[in-house]
Amino acid sequence: VSLYYSDLEPRFYASIAYSGRVWECLTATEDANRDLSVFFYKDSENGQDLMNRELYHWTGIGVCKYVHPDDALTVGGSLKHKIEPTIRYADVLLWYAEALNEIEDGATYSFPSYNNQGVITVSRNTSQMSEAFRQVRFRAGLPDLSQQVYNDRNSFRRALKRERQIELFLESARY
């Protein structure tokens, strides 16, 4: 495998099918059809469309985000049903961090709680922004952003946009 694909963010390996990637294919009935290294280029049979041998990954990359390790398209193999969530908790956390970031400095808003048992007060609070944003990064095995990024509204807005693009890749999300 090319060193080009080494030492990248963990979500890359979970989402992108690159040339040389190993496909586990755990439901394949023959050992030879499991743990396959697949290379995408014109003269390789890997990655070609079975209906049209001229169709293949021209760029050398594809998508593996929704591929389960058990999935195998070989004789005796099977595909796992995937549950596609309507809304992800990671998206809710990113919305929350974004909403806090967009509150003007010094502004405070109060509104009744969902059960009318109290009042919720919100303001641009970088520790709350970090708490929400950090959960998304930690789940992916990534470190938190620096406090400087949280303190600067525009820097955090850029970081948030990039995080949303990577975390919600191929999930019909808009940025």
Where do the PLM segments sit?
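Acidic/polar-rich alpha-helix caps and helix-coil junctions
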Residues: 1-175
